[in-house]
């Protein structure tokens, strides 16, 4: 597929500081093409691995390689569990990622939990918490082991925070545990449907089983990290499988308690961008506080003759998303102080 760069992406008004890659919803499975649950969108299960290979080749060949790649969750498809192919498929995708010459940060989505328990994921190669940054003398910025979240610094004065959008969820947890019972109670209070994956008739359609939320503990931790970033004049990028801003997403795909997450973010000045996957269609909106919400288009529903990934170029005054295939270009200016 021919690619022509848009002129404004390369009319650089200031020096580029660094870049990072983004890719979402690979959902690989060794299966023939299929369709989504509604039967109206084609899914390219095998070809998703070729799209990933193409993205990695591109990042490896960049004249100035990205500092890291953000993998936004749903790395293999839930169908793998049905065919007892979860570990084999994960191994194939992880072997492909080994060709990447820069670190990759893995986010967990619903399809990770269709295939594996939380305990399994914690002890797997999908746990990239070892790449975290630890802030000396600030114990409040150390995340709990109860959820999968951490922060890291790819470049001075830029902090990236990876959130666990299934910290509150009925997926991947032992059904006899108090946590499962608590989350099931929350889900049933908002969703009376027999089929908990159905949003039919719901006032808050995000309360479905394939979504999840952020615990108060995780949001308190997020608040502590953002407080540190405010004080130290850092710019912050937040990463989550689930989106949190309604204007950038189908309402069925939002995190359960997206309002709570927004309230924390909006109480700080440091956050410039929030990247998510999950929707497959992508989406974008700048909120009233100047935070850019970007949902990256899903690899799984990308035709073989197209692509779905991006490279974000970071400048002192803005970020530029250079999209490939289905992923559009975007210029995201930082809010004026």
From Swiss-Prot:
GO terms for molecular function: 2',3'-cyclic-nucleotide 2'-phosphodiesterase activity; ADP-ribose diphosphatase activity; CDP-glycerol diphosphatase activity; manganese ion binding. InterPro entries: Calcineurin-like_PHP_ApaH, Metallo-depent_PP-like, MPP_ADPRM. Zn(2+) 2 binds at residues 74, 110, 241, 278. PANTHER family: MANGANESE-DEPENDENT ADP-RIBOSE_CDP-ALCOHOL DIPHOSPHATASE, PTHR16509. Coiled coil: none annotated. The keyword Iron does not apply. Its cofactor is Mg(2+). Zn(2+) 1 binds at residues 25, 27, 74, 280. Hydrolyzes ADP-ribose, IDP-ribose, CDP-glycerol, CDP-choline and CDP-ethanolamine, but not other non-reducing ADP-sugars or CDP-glucose. May be involved in immune cell signaling as suggested by the second-messenger role of ADP-ribose, which activates TRPM2 as a mediator of oxidative/nitrosative stress. Monomer. The modification N-acetylmethionine is found at residue 1. It comes from Bos taurus (Bovine). The keyword Cell cycle does not apply. Its EC number is 3.6.1.13, 3.6.1.16, 3.6.1.53. This is Manganese-dependent ADP-ribose/CDP-alcohol diphosphatase. Belongs to the ADPRibase-Mn family. Keywords: Acetylation, Hydrolase, Metal-binding, Zinc.
């Amino acid at each position: 597929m021919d690619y022509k760069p848009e002129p404004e992406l390369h009319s650089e008004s200031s020096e580029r500081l660094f870049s990072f890659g983004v890719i979402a919803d690979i959902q690989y499975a060794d299966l023939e093409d299929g369709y989504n649950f509604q039967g109206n969108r084609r899914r390219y299960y095998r070809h998703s691995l070729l799209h990933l290979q193409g993205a990695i080749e591109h990042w490896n060949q960049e004249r100035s390689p990205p500092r890291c790649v953000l993998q936004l969750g749903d790395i293999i498809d839930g169908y793998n569990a049905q065919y007892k192919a979860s570990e084999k498929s994960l191994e194939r995708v992880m072997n492909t990622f080994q060709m990447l010459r820069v670190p990759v940060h893995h986010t967990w989505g619903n399809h990770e939990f269709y295939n594996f328990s939380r305990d399994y994921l914690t002890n797997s190669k999908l746990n990239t918490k070892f790449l975290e940054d630890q802030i000396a003398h600030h114990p409040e910025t150390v995340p709990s082991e109860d959820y999968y979240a951490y922060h890291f610094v790819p470049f001075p004065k830029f902090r990236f925070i990876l959130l666990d959008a299934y910290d509150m969820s009925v997926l991947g947890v032992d059904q006899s545990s108090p946590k499962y019972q608590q989350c099931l109670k929350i889900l049933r209070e908002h969703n009376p449907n027999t089929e908990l994956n159905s949003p039919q008739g719901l006032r808050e359609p995000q309360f479905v089983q394939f979504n999840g939320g952020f615990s108060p503990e995780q949001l308190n931790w997020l608040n502590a990290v953002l407080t540190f970033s405010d004080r130290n004049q850092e710019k912050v990028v937040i990463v989550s499988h689930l989106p949190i801003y309604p204007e950038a997403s189908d309402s069925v795909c939002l995190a359960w308690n997206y309002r709570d997450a927004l309230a924390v973010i909006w109480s700080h000045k440091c956050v410039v961008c929030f990247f998510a996957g999950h929707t497959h269609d992508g989406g974008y909106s700048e909120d009233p506080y100047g935070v850019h919400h970007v949902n990256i288009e899903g690899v799984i529903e990308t035709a073989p003759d197209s692509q779905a990934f991006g490279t974000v170029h970071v400048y002192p005054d803005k970020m530029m998303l250079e999209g490939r295939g289905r992923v559009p270009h975007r210029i995201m200016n930082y809010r004026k102080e």
